[in-house]
Every structure is written in structure tokens, then in C-alpha cells.
Amino acid sequence: MKEKVQTLQDFGEVLHEVRRDMCYATDLLASDLKASKSLFGGVWTGKSHNIEHYIRVFRHLYSEAHNDAQRQKLDDALYALFHPG
């Protein structure tokens, strides 16, 4: 993981992976998925965002994570982002 996350875009990709895993793990209603997409906005479309946007997404995913493995993946990504190399 540590070598994977070197930029904000890398961090966004990990957030997307965890979000996708969370969606597959539950039966999300279409309205829930739509609301989720509007919260995350351009993270999934490749638009650039500042660090505050990514942290807001991280916090939301962390609070909604279904298990320790998802939380650990988020923890590892955040650590790697701020401790490169």
C-alpha cells in the first residue's frame, strides 16, 4: 500500500476502491447511491480536488466502513499519503 499512495489522485483511487467495496457489501438503494455520488463528486471522474475534499470523503467512508479491513485500508492510504517513501 505505501508505495501505491504517493499523490492525492492515488489517495482518491483508494477511497474509490473502499467505497466500491462498501457498495458491494450492502444492498444500496438507488437513491442512496445517487446521494453518495453527489457527496464524492469529481473524485471518481478524475477532476482535481484539494486536500480538504479528500479528507471529507475519507472521514465519511471511515465512519460508514463495514469492517476493520476497510478501516485499515483507509488508515494505510492516509498514512502513506503523508509519509511517502
Question: Residue ranges of each PLM-predicted region?
Answer:
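A short, Lys/Arg-rich alpha-helix, primarily the initiator
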Residues: 1-22
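DNA major-groove recognition helix of helix-turn-helix/homeodomain DNA-binding modules
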Residues: 51-72
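Recognition helix of helix-turn-helix/homeodomain-like DNA-binding domains
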Residues: 33-49
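Short alpha-helical "recognition helix" segments of helix-turn-helix
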Residues: 28-30
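Helix-turn-helix DNA-binding elements, focusing on the entry/boundary residues of the two helices
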Residues: 15, 26, 54
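Short, charged recognition helix plus adjacent turn
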Residues: 2-5, 42, 67-85
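Alpha-helical structural elements of signaling/regulatory helical domains
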Residues: 21-24, 49, 66
